[in-house]
Amino acid sequence: MSDINATRLPLILLAALGIPSDDADSTLTRGER
C-alpha cells in the first residue's frame, strides 16, 4: 500500500496544482482579452 500511496501522491498533487493553474490561466487570458 505504501508503494500505491507513493505513486498516487505526486499524481494527486500535480492534478490539484494543475487544475487550479489551468483555471487561473484561462481567467487571466480572458481578462486580458
UniProtKB/Swiss-Prot annotation:
Q: Which UniProt keywords apply?
A: Toxin
Q: Where is this cross-link: Cyclopeptide (Leu-Pro)?
A: L11-P20
Q: Which residues form the propeptide?
A: 1-10, 21-33
Its PTM note reads: Processed by the macrocyclase-peptidase enzyme POPB to yield a toxic cyclic decapeptide. POPB first removes 10 residues from the N-terminus. Conformational trapping of the remaining peptide forces the enzyme to release this intermediate rather than proceed to macrocyclization. The enzyme rebinds the remaining peptide in a different conformation and catalyzes macrocyclization of the N-terminal 10 residues.
Renumbered to this chain, the signal peptide range is none
InterPro entries assigned: Amanitin/phalloidin
* Keyword Secreted (UniProt): no
State the source organism's domain of life. Answer: Eukaryota
* One function term, GO molecular function aspect: toxin activity
Family recorded in the similarity comment: Belongs to the MSDIN fungal toxin family.
Q: Which NCBIfam families match?
A: amanitin (TIGR04309)
The record's function comment reads: Probable toxin that belongs to the MSDIN-like toxin family responsible for a large number of food poisoning cases and deaths.
Protein name (record): MSDIN-like toxin proprotein 6
Q: What is the lineage of its organism?
A: Eukaryota, Fungi, Dikarya, Basidiomycota, Agaricomycotina
